[in-house]
Regions:
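Short, well-ordered coil/turn segments that N-cap beta-strands
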Residues: 4-8, 43-45, 70-78, 97-99, ...
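Glycine-rich, proline-tolerant flexible connector loops at the mouths of alpha/beta enzymes
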Residues: 22, 43-69, 103-118, 145-153
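Alpha-helix-loop-beta-strand connector modules within alpha/beta enzyme cores
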Residues: 55-84, 122-139, 143
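Conserved, mostly hydrophobic/aromatic
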Residues: 18, 38, 101, 143
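Structured alpha-helical segments in the cores of large, soluble enzyme domains
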Residues: 31-39, 93, 123-137, 156
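Non-cysteine beta-strand/loop elements that form the S-adenosyl-L-methionine
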Residues: 11-13, 98-109, 142
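Catalytic cores of alpha/beta
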Residues: 86-95
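Active-site mouth loops of central-metabolism enzymes
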Residues: 10-32, 77-86, 112-121, 144-156
């Protein structure tokens, strides 16, 4: 979307985050139809379609969408949420045919200490390891900083 000469990038997470809503579960064909509508008719710039390593069925849905998106020239707009687990999420995404990893990381010392039981430095090393591996496999990487605003407030 262009607004006064500036481009605003629209990202939709319905196929990943929407499925976390109680009682919501999309079939693979529903996911495909939603992906096609969002990319072709709505024209979203980015579409996060799944979380890595959820299930074999989810991987098959990602493969189907990635295959279709590749044929339509949309593959660089199809993204999958992954985790700081070095090779596991990266390989799952790569094997699914997707080429963009949205890496979920911790954005606060509190989350590092209390959820991961790691220091900021240890988590940063995990992030680097995962990003370097993803790039070596040819994936583009976006980084999500979970709880960043609280982390910044608590320790700018």
């Amino acid at each position: 979307m262009d607004l006064a000469g500036e481009h605003i990038s629209l990202m939709d997470t319905t196929l990943r985050d929407g499925e976390q809503t109680q009682g919501v579960s999309f079939t693979p064909s529903e996911k495909m139809n939603i992906a096609k509508a969002l990319l072709q008719r709505v024209g979203v710039d980015r579409l996060e379609i799944a979380s890595a390593r959820i299930s074999q069925g989810e991987q098959e849905a990602v493969q189907n969408i990635a295959d279709w998106a590749s044929g339509q020239g949309f593959l660089d707009r199809v993204e999958v949420l992954g985790f700081c687990d070095h090779k596991r999420s990266v390989d799952w995404i790569f094997d699914s045919g997707a080429r963009v990893l949205n890496l979920l990381t911790k954005g606060s010392e509190n989350h590092c200490k209390n959820q991961l039981r790691k220091t900021l430095e240890e988590h940063a090393a995990d992030i680097r390891l995962t990003v370097e591996y993803a790039q070596s496999r040819g994936l583009k990487v976006n980084i999500y900083l979970e709880d960043w605003s609280n982390g910044y407030r608590d320790k700018p």
